[in-house]
Swiss-Prot record:
HAMAP family: KdpC. InterPro entries: KdpC. Part of the high-affinity ATP-driven potassium transport (or Kdp) system, which catalyzes the hydrolysis of ATP coupled with the electrogenic transport of potassium into the cytoplasm. This subunit acts as a catalytic chaperone that increases the ATP-binding affinity of the ATP-hydrolyzing subunit KdpB by the formation of a transient KdpB/KdpC/ATP ternary complex. GO terms for cellular component: plasma membrane. Residues 107-117 have a biased composition (Polar residues). It holds the Pfam family KdpC. Residues 87-117 are annotated as: Disordered. It comes from Deinococcus radiodurans (strain ATCC 13939 / DSM 20539 / JCM 16871 / CCUG 27074 / LMG 4051 / NBRC 15346 / NCIMB 9279 / VKM B-1422 / R1). GO terms for molecular function: ATP binding; P-type potassium transmembrane transporter activity. GO terms for biological process: potassium ion transmembrane transport. The system is composed of three essential subunits: KdpA, KdpB and KdpC. Belongs to the KdpC family. This is Potassium-transporting ATPase KdpC subunit.
């Protein structure tokens, strides 16, 4: 009778495992890279584009707004309204595409100032905007100015303002258009959107939608 140790001693040694040739490793890596590029760079974007176009055609196309057959803007991108007869949006810190100077609501160069809350430039800019907002809307020094009226969004392209900011502009818009303030306020409230999911954000109005409605009065 043989013992286990004897069997181990009499067994032939296992052959040494041969390393995978380098060309084969490179070929495997290349094939994996090509596969992931096709899946992640072609198949997945095409699939999401087709699904989004079928399920959400308006949003997938940019949420474009038309008037008399002409595209006048997008519901999700703000515009730089400055005339007294229009509702004004938030400040925008976007610049020209070549960086040569400011260009509010430039969708080709979205971004913010990147100034921190303690930065003297930001504090000075906000104080200047508060004074300008009060002056253009005929507000007294004791009237609180909503924060969204004097601060830019992270994208510089925010299409909405809070209801409070919109209502503070009613008298200026009404005077410029020869309307009653109640009529302007009615248009603004007709475009009021509530908080997202009933919890997030503030009640807001879309600036472009309000201005188009005002032009249609």
């Amino acid at each position: 009778m043989t013992t286990p140790n004897a069997n181990l001693q009499n067994s032939a040694p296992l052959p040494a495992e041969r390393p995978t040739p380098l060309p084969r490793l490179l070929l495997s890596a290349l094939l994996a890279a090509v596969l992931f590029m096709l899946v992640c760079g072609l198949a997945y974007p095409l699939l999401t584009t087709v699904v989004a176009g079928a399920a959400f055609p308006n949003q997938a196309g940019g949420s474009l707004v038309t008037r008399n057959g002409q595209v006048v803007g997008s519901a999700v991108l703000g515009q730089n309204f400055t005339a007294p007869r229009y509702l004004h949006g938030r400040p925008s810190m976007t610049s020209k595409t070549d960086g040569s100077g400011p260009e509010p609501y430039n969708a080709e160069n979205s971004g913010a100032s990147n100034w921190g809350p303690t930065n003297a430039k930001l504090q000075g800019a906000v104080q200047g905007r508060i004074a300008a907002f009060r002056q253009e809307n005929g507000l007294g020094a004791d009237v609180p100015v909503p924060i969204d009226a004097v601060t830019a969004s992270a994208s510089g392209l925010d299409p909405d303002v809070t209801l409070a900011t919109a209502l503070l502009q009613v008298n200026r818009i009404a005077q410029a258009r020869g309307m009653q303030p109640a009529g302007v306020e009615k248009v603004i409230r007709a475009h009021l959107k509530g908080r997202d999911l009933g919890l997030l954000g503030e009640p807001r109005v879309n600036v472009l939608a309000v201005n188009l409605s005002l032009d249609g009065q």
